[in-house]
């Protein structure tokens, strides 16, 4: 089974405000609200939405086998195999292809992690029309030790000290995945921002964005090894270069 393609960074003016904890600005406290779908359409499973009536990740701390899927076109999302769709997973997100990790399989169906609120939300999508690949890599973040480890075939390929969320704006724990690769349109604190499919649990919004958690660089090395962010994970320049080569959909496991 081939691996998913490495994402080419997309230049977006919104990159700097999409994610939480990425510099100056403020957030709005709370637990998020459901984004209404226009005209009664099903809500889209994106980083901007909150989805109702879908199951939570059954094993939020377990390792995944690296199987990831990409819908060739918008896929219906159900709470159970064969149940009516309650959301839709678009084929593209943030100007790039949607790749999501598989957490469970049944005949004709794949249960996948979704990039929406609440954190750890999952849904079942039909396996017809899916491109399937396998990522041999995984990313682990230990919030307590404030370290990030890149795994290749289950073995550490690099470990770095990182900055994580402050006590009042912690980095959320659980399983998620690499969602996108964004290059800010204007010079900012990081040449690359790598959003994941998780959000701040304490901020509804941050800097005009939906409070998406991301990996990104930082101009000062003094922050590494500290709990000082609004939820994002600030990484050293060498780590960011390595993470930039990781395919979209690659599992990310964040532990306390």
Task: Please provide the spans of the model-predicted regions.
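Bacterial signal peptide processing site
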Residues: 23-26
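Exported/periplasmic cell-wall-interacting domains
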Residues: 116, 129-138, 170-175, 185-256
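A mature extracytoplasmic/lumenal domain signature
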Residues: 81, 106, 114-118, 129, ...
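SH3/SH3-like beta-barrel superfamily modules
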Residues: 88-128
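Bacterial N-terminal signal peptides that target proteins for export
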Residues: 1-10
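Boundary regions of SH3-family modules and the immediately adjacent low-complexity/disordered segments
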Residues: 32-62, 114-141
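Beta-loop motif signature
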Residues: 39-101
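C-terminal motif of bacterial Sec signal peptides marking the signal peptidase cleavage site
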Residues: 18-21
């Amino acid at each position: 089974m081939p691996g998913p393609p490495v994402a080419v960074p997309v230049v977006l003016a919104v990159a700097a405000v999409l994610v939480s904890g990425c510099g100056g600005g403020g957030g709005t406290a709370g637990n998020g609200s459901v984004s209404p779908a226009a005209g009664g359409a099903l809500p889209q499973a994106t980083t901007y939405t909150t989805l109702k009536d879908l199951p939570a990740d059954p094993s939020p701390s377990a390792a995944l086998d690296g199987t990831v899927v990409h819908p060739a076109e918008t896929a219906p999302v159900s709470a159970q195999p064969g149940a009516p769709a309650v959301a839709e997973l678009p084929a593209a997100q943030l100007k790039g292809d949607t790749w999501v990790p598989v957490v469970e399989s049944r005949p004709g169906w794949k249960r996948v992690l979704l990039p929406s609120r609440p954190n750890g939300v999952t849904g079942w999508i039909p396996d017809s029309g899916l491109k399937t690949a396998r990522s041999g890599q995984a990313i682990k973040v230990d919030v307590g030790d404030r370290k990030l480890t890149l795994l290749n075939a289950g073995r550490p390929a690099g470990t770095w000290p990182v900055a994580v969320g402050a006590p009042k704006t912690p980095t959320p724990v659980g399983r998620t995945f690499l969602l996108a690769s964004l290059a800010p349109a204007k010079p900012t604190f990081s040449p690359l921002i790598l959003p994941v499919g998780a959000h701040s649990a304490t901020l509804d919004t941050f800097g005009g964005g939906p409070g998406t958690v991301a990996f990104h660089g930082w101009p000062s090395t003094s922050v590494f090894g500290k709990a000082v962010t609004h939820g994002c994970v600030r990484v050293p320049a060498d780590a960011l270069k390595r993470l930039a080569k990781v395919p979209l959909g690659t599992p990310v496991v964040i532990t306390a």
